[in-house]
From Swiss-Prot:
Entry function: Produces ATP from ADP in the presence of a proton gradient across the membrane. The gamma chain is believed to be important in regulating ATPase activity and the flow of protons through the CF(0) complex.
Protein family: Belongs to the ATPase gamma chain family.
Gene3D superfamilies documented for this protein: 3.40.1380.10, ATP synthase, gamma subunit, helix hairpin domain
Protein name (Swiss-Prot/TrEMBL): ATP synthase gamma chain
Length: 286
């Protein structure tokens, strides 16, 4: 059994670690609330943009934008959003498992794949994964802006425009609640039809300028807004996962301290018992 002094030093070390994890838990909780506010603020914009595009696309029968046309999938692109930092449980691992499984399915169909990782962990993973990395972004911070993503996203849009990509997906962790974050793969291009798009008896609208010009602008903004929404959702998921992970670490540190304290008490009791035995033995000898 280790001596009482060594155990006491270990207890002090674990207590210091516990203070750090507790502080990180509180910081993550604060950042998560701010990320949730940004997420809630950006969702209506993305949803409204999708509805407007659906109306314009359905009302413009004489013009079909390339982003709306389905073509044979020979080359698939993924914009994969992960975190810049670790200490967030299995958040990134679960995301990478999902996207690699989807990649495997596409490759089994004979499709080629390329990636656009966002976040330092995503960049690091896909550079070691061996796939083609066409563009990347990292270091977006806790309050990312759409302007920080536009250049990266447009590299993938340009590839789609030139026929180098036939499908484009965004992959991120969707924030469900504090305890649940789900990795999702959402199709960006060609624009998937929603249930709302296939409804009949639509009103006719007069568009100014013409539908072609509107779609040219809106579709690019739509893709950018969907990627931005994914980044915001992933950020909220990251902070929630980190808060939960740090709480678990703090609780585990508490359990470890209790265990060490018990060992320390036993060691101290053994030392006192030994000293008493030596005193009694010495007195008996006299």
């Amino acid at each position: 059994m280790a001596g009482a002094k060594e155990i006491k030093t270990k207890i002090a070390s674990v207590k210091n670690t516990q203070k750090i994890t507790s502080a990180m838990e509180m910081v993550a909780a604060s950042k998560m609330r701010r990320a949730q506010e940004r997420m809630a603020a950006s969702r209506p914009y993305a949803e409204s943009m999708r509805k407007v595009i659906g109306h314009v696309a359905q009302g413009s029968l004489e013009f079909k934008h390339p982003y709306l046309e389905v073509r044979e999938a020979k080359r698939v692109g993924y914009i994969v959003v992960a975190t810049d930092r670790g200490l967030c449980g299995g958040l990134n691992v679960n995301l990478f498992k999902k996207v690699t499984l989807d990649v495997k399915n596409w490759k089994a169909q004979g499709a080629e794949v390329e990636f656009c990782p966002i976040g330092a962990r995503s960049v690091q993973f896909f550079k070691s994964f061996g796939g083609q990395v066409s563009a990347h972004a990292s270091g977006l911070g806790d309050a990312p802006k759409l302007a920080d993503l536009i250049g990266t996203v447009r590299v993938m849009l340009q590839a789609y425009n030139e026929g180098k990509l036939d499908r484009l997906y965004v992959v991120f962790n969707k924030f469900v609640n504090t305890m649940a974050q789900t990795p999702v793969i959402e199709q960006l291009l060609p624009l998937p039809k929603s249930a709302d798009d296939v409804k009949t008896n639509r009103w006719d609208y007069i568009y100014e300028p013409d539908p072609k010009e509107i779609l040219e602008t809106l579709l690019v903004r739509y893709v950018e807004s969907q990627v931005y929404q994914g980044v915001i959702e992933n950020l909220a998921s990251e902070q929630a996962a980190r808060m939960v992970a740090m709480k678990a670490a703090t609780d585990n540190a508490g359990d470890m301290i209790d265990g060490l304290q018990l060992v320390y008490n036993k060691a101290r009791q053994a030392a006192i018992t030994q000293e008493l035995s030596e005193i009694v033995s010495g007195a008996s000898a006299v």
